[in-house]
Amino acid sequence: MKADNPFDLLLPAAMAKVAEEAGVYKATKHPLKTFYLAITAGVFISIAFVFYITATTGTGTMPFGMAKLVGGICFSLGLILCVVCGADLFTSTVLIVVAKASGRITWGQLAKNWLNVYFGNLVGALLFVLLMWLSGEYMTANGQWGLNVLQTADHKVHHTFIEAVCLGILANLMVCLAVWMSYSGRSLMDKAFIMVLPVAMFVASGFEHSIANMFMIPMGIVIRDFASPEFWTAVGSAPENFSHLTVMNFITDNLIPVTIGNIIGGGLLVGLTYWVIYLRENDHH
């Protein structure tokens, strides 16, 4: 603890410097290492959505807000795993704009890192979709687990383009604020605990996270297309009721607009905002 900082944590200006250094490290490390870490992040976020679905299945008698709060708290596991284990998650990787704004990396390095991480996250999420499908987990609770996935995924492909962009902005505003606050902590529990409520807030509110959707919507598509007749009988529904769950609708109605929103929410509203406040003057001098 320094004499000019009476608190056992990093103060906001120092947090901004940590974000800058983290951005330089992320953008300059070996691309293959980045890709592997991105795959793990895709898996971690998928694990979090599995936890969310499991926790919210069968909560029909609970008040709406309480059920969503429980699910949101469970989902925070994903970001905690990414931060503590060092995985590269696209939605927090957008914060490397701080390093670019300070002139520490090039536009080319930024673009290559974003693309590498984004597609690594996609690979990790789709691998976990395969694992969950082969596990037969969708039949849990007499098929209600799978029905919860279908209903959640179907809702996500019914936003307008503008709605999806705005929901993406709101989601990554909270995710990047959670990551930014973790830069302040000095202990494992500091970093983990401080991220729970921002993540729980965005999940409970129904905001849209592009990487989480890389698991949830494909999982819904797989269940819709390949679930057994016994599943549909158990849940009292049919594939036709989820006809909007297609790969094309996933890409055009959710993934593209939500990704745009995530970049704006994290890169502009968090990263560049704090760069202007804490680092722009230093960079200018």
From Swiss-Prot:
Localization annotation: Cell inner membrane
Catalytic activity entry: formate(in) = formate(out)
Site (Important for formate translocation): 91, 209
Result when mutating residue 91 to S: Allows maintenance of efflux function. Does not affect intracellular formate levels. Causes disassembly into lower oligomeric forms. Exhibits partial sensitivity to the toxic formate analog hypophosphite
GO terms for biological process, alphabetical: formate transport; mixed acid fermentation; response to acidic pH
Transmembrane parts of this sequence: 31-56, 65-85, 113-135, 161-181, 188-205, 250-276
Signals that turn on the gene: Part of the focA-pflB operon, which is induced anaerobically. Transcription of the operon is restricted to the exponential phase of growth. Expression is subject to complex transcriptional and post-transcriptional control. The tight coupling between FocA and PflB synthesis ensures adequate substrate delivery to the appropriate formate dehydrogenase (FDH).
Effect on the protein upon substituting residue 209 to T: Converts FocA into a formate-efflux channel. Shows weak formate uptake. Uptake of the toxic formate analog hypophosphite is strongly impaired
Effect listed in the UniProt record for changing residue 90 to Y: Does not affect intracellular formate levels. Causes disassembly into lower oligomeric forms
Keywords tagged on the record: Cell inner membrane, Cell membrane, Membrane, Transmembrane, Transmembrane helix, Transport
Consequence recorded when altering residue 91 to Y: Exhibits partial sensitivity to the toxic formate analog hypophosphite
Reported effect, residue 209 to A/I: Converts FocA into a formate-efflux channel. Shows either no, or a minimal, formate uptake. Uptake of the toxic formate analog hypophosphite is strongly impaired
Subunit relationships: Homopentamer. Interacts directly with the pyruvate formate-lyase PflB. PflB interacts with the cytoplasmically oriented face of FocA and the N-terminal helix of FocA is important for this specific interaction. Also interacts with the ketobutyrate/pyruvate formate-lyase TdcE.
Protein purpose: Involved in the bidirectional transport of formate during mixed-acid fermentation. Functions to maintain relatively constant intracellular formate levels during growth, using different mechanisms for efflux and uptake of the anion. Has a strong preference for formate as a substrate in vivo and not other acidic fermentation products.
Note: Overexpression results in enhanced sensitivity to the toxic formate analog hypophosphite.
Free-text comment about domains: The mechanism appears to be controlled by at least two key structural features of the protein. One of these is the cytoplasmic N-terminal domain, which is crucial for bidirectional translocation of formate across the membrane, suggesting a 'gate-keeper' function controlling anion accessibility. The other structural feature involves two highly conserved amino acid residues: Thr-91 and His-209. Thr-91 is essential for the ability of FocA to translocate formate in both directions.
Family of this protein: Belongs to the FNT transporter (TC 1.A.16) family.
Protein name: Formate channel FocA
Source organism (scientific name): Escherichia coli (strain K12)
Gene behind the chain: focA
